[in-house]
Amino acid sequence: MHIFDELKERGLIFQTTDEEALRKALEEGQVSYYTGYDPTADSLHLGHLVAILTSRRLQLAGHKPYALVGGATGLIGDPSFKDAERSLQTKDTVDGWVKSIQGQLSRFLDFENGENKAVMVNNYDWFGSISFIDFLRDIGKYFTVNYMMSKESVKKRIETGISYTEFAYQIMQGYDFFVLNQDHNVTLQIGGSDQWGNMTAGTELLRRKADKTGHVITVPLITDATGKKFGKSEGNAVWLNPEKTSPYEMYQFWMNVMDADAIRFLKIFTFLSLDEIEDIRKQFEAAPHERLAQKVLAREVVTLVHGEEAYKEALNITEQLFAGNIKNLSVKELKQGLRGVPNYQVQADENNNIVELLVSSGIVNSKRQAREDVQNGAIYVNGDRIQDLDYVLSDADKLENELTVIRRGKKKYFVLTY
């Protein structure tokens, strides 16, 4: 299947400039293309993965990727469809974020092998040395204010106010495309659909300043079946950095994907063939309660982002917590699996009687409730049911001398630390 058709079939193409010309270019030989990543945090998140994996698919088809990290544009801030001005970051902060993002991208793109190996570039390399006068004379003169004001991303901010700093962002992104075209013969840019205005600023600059044609592909901004923006878990971004979102948390995110989204997400976020995904769809629809699509999705994406060992660990944590086998997990695994659950620091002189601890830690509100829960068999210490009102937690209950896991009922976990 032609790479362009595969991208379409997978739901990865939202808009293109000239589909026929782009398809022809991809057929005739190796195309150099780029995707830009502004450092707005110290990690990329799941929302970035759509463009990253699209870039990887094109590389696997023989085309050459350039990964542009915005060391300069990250200092400015992209106004596209944002309700308010971004806070400006210091150069040291942005530089640190650039390094983190560069490391993450190397997990997905091949920077080492073949004539189409990926190349990392930083737009601070050209913006850092250009003077304001040169910027206005050599770049700004090719953009009319009318053209810049016509961008949807700018229109939405005019009434609430937009600084010249952010207004000029589209020119900077346009110049990125121009520089990469002149220096590396890059003719295609890939980005999110919210970037259309900035990306076509690049094709406009190429046309007017160099009389060349540039192409653009935007990938869709992913939403779930309810229309909710994709890539958030409990309102927080799902990060690609395991220190910010653990492999277990990412695994759970994919396992909780709605049935209506699961097959679509397999096409977007995995490298399984379309035939394999069709087979999974048939099995999934025959027995949706088995959640085959979610299991495959979780396996494929966690392995892709964090590696096979991290996936196996996330799966093991899931299975052991579900079975209540707390003692089968290391403290490291427990910290990953129980990150975010209520945590209580036990004082050295504290009464360690189970009833007293249930109240002092805030697990229950009263001693009466604590006694009822214990007598009814609703309290577990490290997976063991405790029904003795006189039970006192001892050193044996301190896993690796660090923590004790209390479970109330079937699913409510609490962690005591020492």
UniProtKB/Swiss-Prot annotation:
Motif ('HIGH' region): 39-48
The keyword Nucleotide-binding belongs to this UniProt entry's keyword annotation: yes
Pfam families: SYY_C-terminal, tRNA-synt_1b
Purpose: Catalyzes the attachment of tyrosine to tRNA(Tyr) in a two-step reaction: tyrosine is first activated by ATP to form Tyr-AMP and then transferred to the acceptor end of tRNA(Tyr).
EC numbers: 6.1.1.1
Motif mapping: 'KMSKS' region: 229-233
HAMAP family found in the cross-reference section: Tyr_tRNA_synth_type1 (MF_02006)
Record field: catalytic activity: tRNA(Tyr) + L-tyrosine + ATP = L-tyrosyl-tRNA(Tyr) + AMP + diphosphate + H(+)
Entry GO MF terms: ATP binding; RNA binding; tyrosine-tRNA ligase activity
Domain S4 RNA-binding, residue spans: 352-418
Protein name (record): Tyrosine--tRNA ligase
Residues at which L-tyrosine binds: 34, 169, 173
InterPro entries in the record: aa-tRNA-synth_I_CS, aa-tRNA-synth_Ic, Rossmann-like_a/b/a_fold, S4_RNA-bd, S4_RNA-bd_sf, SYY-like_C, Tyr-tRNA-ligase, Tyr-tRNA-ligase_bac-type
Residue intervals passing through the bilayer: none
Gene: tyrS
Major enzyme class: ligase
Location in the cell: Cytoplasm
Family: Belongs to the class-I aminoacyl-tRNA synthetase family. TyrS type 1 subfamily.
Keyword ATP-binding belongs to the record: yes
